[in-house]
């Protein structure tokens, strides 16, 4: 009867921000989140700002919150921050019903999701001499 230990995904050199209960499905969030992983924070925010998707506003707010956490809590340099991880998970699904013909009802599913953004500082590659 051992309790499962909670695994902390963040390391010491990372900063995270979580946005719970976003009114969108995981299927719609995943392509947007995969597009910003590995990019600098300012580039990721700019791409989200000019995207035509409705949900990018919520993702942009989460990335901005992670940047604020990095600046205030850990004193990281904003210009060196990159998006290390960005993933989403399922939350609750609200179930509603729409009346249809002949007394029937059709289900309407309204899924909710959670977004986690993890930032880290980009490591500078130092070159020691030339490669020959």
UniProtKB/Swiss-Prot annotation:
The organism's place on the tree of life at top rank: Bacteria
GO molecular function: rRNA binding; structural constituent of ribosome
GO biological process: translation
Gene Ontology CC entries for this record: cytosolic large ribosomal subunit
Gene3D superfamilies: Ribosomal protein L22/L17 (3.90.470.10)
Entries under CDD domains matching the protein: Ribosomal_L22
Keywords from the named record: Ribonucleoprotein, Ribosomal protein, RNA-binding, rRNA-binding
UniProt keyword Ribonucleoprotein, yes or no: yes
Keyword Membrane: no
HAMAP family per record: Ribosomal_uL22_B
Function, as annotated: This protein binds specifically to 23S rRNA; its binding is stimulated by other ribosomal proteins, e.g. L4, L17, and L20. It is important during the early stages of 50S assembly. It makes multiple contacts with different domains of the 23S rRNA in the assembled 50S subunit and ribosome. The globular domain of the protein is located near the polypeptide exit tunnel on the outside of the subunit, while an extended beta-hairpin is found that lines the wall of the exit tunnel in the center of the 70S ribosome.
Subunit and interaction comment: Part of the 50S ribosomal subunit.
Similarity section: Belongs to the universal ribosomal protein uL22 family.
This protein's name: Large ribosomal subunit protein uL22
The species this protein was found in: Pelagibacter ubique (strain HTCC1062)
